[in-house]
Amino acid sequence: LESISVSVKPDNLSRIEGIGPKLEAMLNENSIYTFRQLSDAAPAQLQGILDKGGEAYRIHDPGTWPEQAKLLAEGKIEDFEKLTLELKGGKRVD
């Protein structure tokens, strides 16, 4: 049988507060390329991906990544920008 590959246009995941180029590459290696895919991922699943990367990645907190990605996937740019003002390194700050 021939395998059918579906071409997905990747989003710039580093737009997410807390994700830089190395984390974006790690997500891509785990088949997360789009804001929609990231928004559908559970924070625990994302933490598992980070944990596999070792200590340097384990310290990151992906708790808000799906929420941020959902806003971008839905084109809610103003809401996304408001949310990112409340975040530092992807985490909510009081």
Which residue stretches match the model-derived regions?
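C-terminal extensions
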Residues: 1-17, 21-94
